[in-house]
Amino acid sequence: MNNSSLEHPGAIPGQEYRFDAFEDGKVLHKKKKGRMPAMGWNSWNAFGSGNTEQLTLEMAKCIKELGLDKLGYRYLVLDDGCYRNERVNGLLTNDEVKFPHGFRYLADRLHEMGLKFGMYNDIGTNLCAGAAVGTCGHEREDAGSYISWDVDFLKVDNCYYLWDDATFSDKENAKYVFAPALGKVVIRRDEVYLEEFSPGINMHIVGNGIHTEDIDGKLFFTHIGTFDGTGPAQTPVGVESGEVVLDADIPEDGTYDISIELICGRSSESGRGEWLQAASECSQTTQYQFDGLIDGKDCEGSGFCIKASLKAGRNRIRFMNHRRQENTLMSYAKLLEGLKEAAPDRDIVYSLCEWGKTQPQNWGWKVADSWRILNDITFAVGSDGNPGKADWVSGYTNSVTSQYNKAVVMDEFSGTDRGWNDPDMMVIGMDGLNSAQNRTHMVMWCMMNSPLMLGLDLRRVKKGDELYRVIANEEMIALDQDKLGIQAKRIYTDLIGAGSDKEYITNNDRVDILAKPLSDGSVAVSFINLSGSRKDEGYSVSAREIAEKLGDRMAGPDTFINAGSYVIRDLWTKEESKNCDGVFRINDLEAYDNYTIRIIPG
């Protein structure tokens, strides 16, 4: 394989990387299917860039002493801050102060303890903390290093990325993200006029996000690209990009000139870039006619012309820029390709951390086991002796509820045949959350099949104490790891009526009811009070309502509905009761708390 270019985005290597193939069911580079959400510990929330070999081994010792490995917490992942700031002879190298014995030594020690070893990198030129050791342009060498270090897990970030205006990237990279503003289009053959198309008349928008703007008295389409999902403003459900289309009647097969009035730019705010994709569709066949940057001299006016090979009949011409997603997919795929080339049979969990920027719920499953859905859950990370701080609510992504509110409506994107939505590492055990919030945080992540990556200094946990009882609740963990692999669906919220499973809601003054089907035919149901006030209105849901909402995702819905009785098991108190009417109730919920039960048909 060749490393990716540092000069320009690569050519699309095959149709399987295209936007049109995001739902084709075909993974890239033999990505493994069927893996359950990863469980373990990541160094970032606990220690930031200050993690060390000694601290990692102490965390491993805690995992063993607490018996957390027996519950599934086996991966210990070194996050940012573990490498030297520059490459040595083109290769990644350990920070000799923090990790004096090298990474293979640490991997061997963890493996001797029956644990797994994870590391971190970035598809950009630098890591998020600044070290100039990103994988871009070094994928083959880095893959070889990770194999030689016996890595079991790889988290890959998205800072300093060259082909998007990502975190710490050049803002002018927006030229790759958006198409130019698009005005009139004229189709000719042999300089003979065939047809003219104008915005809003016989040129139309499909999808979402495109604006129609008057620029100097002319109509143009702008913001032709993909929504940025890094922050909490954009719903993850539905079409996340837009195209401009026109339908042309072509008299005969041949080469035609498509002249386009356009205005280029390099600003996400203006929604004008310099990268254009144009494709024609005729008789269910798609042919890409152009996919590249517009040359500077063609960036304004009507001088840009595409030589297009068109078929006789009705042709749909599509103007778009899906490269924000396609480029990012290619970058993550390139490192996976390197890993598979270096060791085809190695089983490495691949965790994407591009913060939901390019809507990875659409394409991440092709290469990865999980994909982050937002920016970080906390920016107040800890250090040795400082537990760091987390929040329940915030105006941005840095809170438990910000992550939950997005992930809870993303159930359609996860599963054993795809991978898992990742609302970031857990913040249980950091300062800022009370006991009820810690419990509900654990419930949310387990019900949503999220990766369970602890982010606290485990020396703060004593076997049997309050923190331990949360992170070591075997019956909660069993929900997350249930082999059916179905993320819970929100079947009710008291803020709206219909559409509770797909409506993206950021108002936390509410109660949600989640239902998660399990492989043995039982169903987990959680009543969650997100608010800071006691809720005493009473809430209920019936077996029939649960089955109707979950549909064919359930194992044996008819058996569940028609059961004469049910055993109700409280997954926190372990108390059991019998239910004979098929209606499951809670009279009140304390602030931030939850009532989570397993309903077993009798």
What residue ranges belong to the model's regions?
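N-terminal module-boundary/linker segments of secreted carbohydrate-active enzymes
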Residues: 2-53, 336-340, 348, 528
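Glycan-recognition surfaces
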Residues: 329-333, 337-457
